[in-house]
């Protein structure tokens, strides 16, 4: 995106003053175009695949959109800005709800348009999350920037009250770096925002995948050095 050197320098300085730490140059972080973090759902009733994703709209400004496809290859993207980044969507009481980073909830009647902003839960340094609904409870797998080591945690939310009264439970660690390929032998250091360079003692980016009723979790290991698969038993 186009931005003057003076405006970019001012934006970088504001981020630094706020205490933001990133793993690379902040100017790069604020201006690098990208499409990322797909959240994909198979809509059997309407024979379509729905994908939520985010990208860079302008300097320092990212947001999410939604696209749909009949074959999983060719997608038609909507133009509406539906919310913050790293959206994870779920169905509840005939509506589509979404959890974005950091802890911001939205909902929509059709899952494509007019997303209403709701409560914000969790903590400001929440990173990415993965969600699944079981018996009126939302299970949220998530990680927290700054933890040493960053690990995958689980919190639950009772969905029965009005969403303005939702509250997350205290987190429980479900996965931490314990194997060599998970970064177990790297130094224990607090994690930072953005890309993880090299072999670090961190687990990140949980994503849930359901097949034949079995729930699996994919997650990033040793920072972002690989992807592992675990089975989730409820």
Regions found by a protein language model. Name each.
Residues 1-201, 210-234:
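Beta-rich carbohydrate-recognition and catalytic domains
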């Amino acid at each position: 995106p186009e931005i003057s050197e003076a405006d970019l320098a001012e934006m970088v300085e504001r981020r630094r003053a706020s205490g933001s730490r990133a793993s690379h140059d902040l100017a790069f972080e604020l201006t690098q175009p990208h499409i990322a973090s797909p959240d994909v759902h198979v809509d059997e009733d309407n024979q379509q695949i729905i994908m939520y994703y985010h990208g860079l709209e302008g300097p320092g400004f990212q947001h999410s959109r939604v696209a749909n496809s009949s074959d999983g290859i060719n997608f038609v993207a909507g133009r509406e800005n539906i919310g913050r980044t790293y959206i994870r969507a779920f169905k509840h009481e005939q509506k589509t709800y979404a959890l974005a980073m950091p802890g911001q909830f939205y909902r929509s009647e059709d899952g494509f348009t007019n997303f209403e902003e709701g409560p914000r839960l969790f903590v400001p340094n929440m990173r990415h999350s993965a969600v699944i609904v079981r018996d009126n409870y939302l299970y949220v797998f998530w990680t927290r920037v700054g933890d040493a080591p960053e690990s995958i945690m689980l919190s639950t939310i009772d969905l029965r009250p009005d969403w303005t009264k939702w509250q997350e439970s205290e987190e429980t660690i479900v996965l931490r770096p314990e194997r060599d390929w998970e970064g177990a032998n790297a130094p224990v250091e607090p994690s930072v925002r953005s890309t993880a360079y090299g072999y670090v003692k961190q687990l990140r980016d949980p994503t849930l995948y359901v097949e034949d009723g079995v729930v699996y979790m994919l997650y990033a290991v040793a920072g972002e050095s690989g992807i592992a698969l675990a089975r989730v038993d409820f």
